[in-house]
Amino acid sequence: MFTSHFSASAVTAAAILSTFANGLPTSLVSKVKRGDSLKFNFGSEKIRGVNTGGWFVLEPWITPSIFEATPSNVVDEYTFCQTLGKTEAESRLQQHWSTWITESDFAEMASIGLNFVRIPIGYWSVSPLPGDPYVQGAYEYLGEALNWAQSNNLMVMIDLHGAPGSQNGFDNSGRRGPIDWTQGNTIAQTHTALNKIRDDYASHPAVAAIELVNEPLGPDLDMDTVRQFYMDGWGDLEDSHVAITFHDAFEGVNSWNDWGSGMWALMEDTHHYEVFDSGSLQMSLSEHISTACSFGASMATNNKWTVAGEWTGAMTDCAQWLNGRGVGARYDGTYNYNGESSSYIGSCDGKYSGTVAGLSQADHNNIKSFINAQMQAFEDAAGWIFWCWKNEAAPEWHFQNLTAAGMVPQPLSSANGCSS
């Protein structure tokens, strides 16, 4: 999840490069024939999914209880393992992995009409590096999760969420702080992890997509290096019968149309949040909806399948530690990180830590309308994957509970929030 410290407007200037009917872009038809054994009808069948955020890659805001039991310097999975030591860290993480999401969650996902699950995992769980403090074990649970998905007719995108050196400096990369991905041997090490995922799991009947790396922070990276990494990653996976998924690197949802010629089965992943800059946080409900609907229309002009691989019902950044442990929220003026602060916009009461049931009726109605609009908007393109399925205390981000509360359209195909 794009959490924190890269302040970019949620509104991407969309260049309308081409127009085509919903479904498979004409420019992709011939390319897909080379990989004609894809396991999902991307484009013609809409992706409707959720992320299992916080399961195999810790995030303080998703499971604050895990971090509250540690000193305040523990801000990510790296410092969690480093501070506790491998024996204690493994004990706590084994308990978390085995209980946070279970087969019953996958059954419930299927029962409400979802057809896709994006499962984030860090390189350290796949191909650990000497000297890393991380502990292993999540990779085996990933294999079990794929079987659960298959049993419930769900397709899976395996998402390499954390790369060696950190590709964005966010806590959700495993290590908050400097961005050292692309330095030294980190690119080669990332390919090693991806190739192991390919060899172990690409042939699994439930695996329909593999994402090369989550949210590389393009403005802070050499984009020629990122593009070459994507090309080489595609080359490693091209015959694996999966959609080879790449994130837009915050370069703009329409910025990749001139890239990827001759590469089949490519899917672009774009993440749409309207909470990580003060301009977005000050928008009215109608402005939030208009922004999302316009973004979906921009997605639909791409010449590659484009999925909103992360999005949320939130219109505030109030959730405890959403921007990082100890950082605060822009919305209520408590944000303070690396010299950046914020001014008060509104109260975080009921949203800092709480439940869907505890939301005000106004919040209930507004979030419901925002979700309804985004679901329709993103289905103008390849579809959507909500962030995230569950969390401990962030009601705007809890798809399971939002659905139970009647705030997600049922059936999912009935979303119409951009139609009025």
Identify the meaning behind each predicted range.
Residues 54, 58-136, 384:
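Active-site-adjacent substrate/metal-binding segments within catalytic domains
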Residues 90-117, 131-162, 173-209, 229, ...:
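An active-site-proximal structural segment forming one wall of the substrate-binding cleft
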Residues 60-75, 133-137, 165-182, 322-333, ...:
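Aromatic- and acidic-residue-enriched segments that line the glycan-binding/catalytic groove
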Residues 206-207, 213-372:
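Extracellular glycoside hydrolase catalytic/binding regions
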